Regions:
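Core of compact, soluble alpha-helical bundle domains
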Residues: 1-117
Length: 117
């Protein structure tokens, strides 16, 4: 997995406005979760290269946006999206245990920062 290019394609939303008017700073929360995860796993940066942090933030931003849209509007099937992401990352050799840890970290950050998360 060395030599990852920076994330391309459709960018995840930076923020979301929920039905009740609450704005969720998706990018900020994903960045916090990514930083925590990679601080605990610096070997990921060594293994995957200089764009590891960008990809981690990108993927966690998507996951948080899917979770918020699923919970708020039922507009996205979070479990289907997570299944897809896990299959993509697994096919690229990314350890699913590390994905699970990153998702737990994202959940912790969301619980700390969002009301009624």
């Amino acid at each position: 997995m060395r030599g990852l290019a920076p994330p391309t394609g459709q960018a995840p939303p930076a923020d979301l406005v929920l039905r009740d008017g609450t704005t969720v700073d998706v990018a900020g929360l994903a960045a916090t979760a990514s930083d925590r995860h990679l601080a605990r796993h610096p070997e990921e940066i060594e293994r995957h290269g200089p764009y590891t942090r960008d990809w981690c933030r990108h993927d966690l931003q998507w996951v948080l946006s899917w979770a918020a849209l699923d919970a708020d509007r039922g507009a996205v099937d979070l479990l289907a999206q997570l299944d897809w992401l896990a299959r993509v990352l697994s096919a690229r050799g990314y350890p699913l245990a590390s994905l699970a840890e990153a998702l737990e970290t994202l959940a912790d950050v969301a619980e700390e920062e969002l009301p009624a998360a």
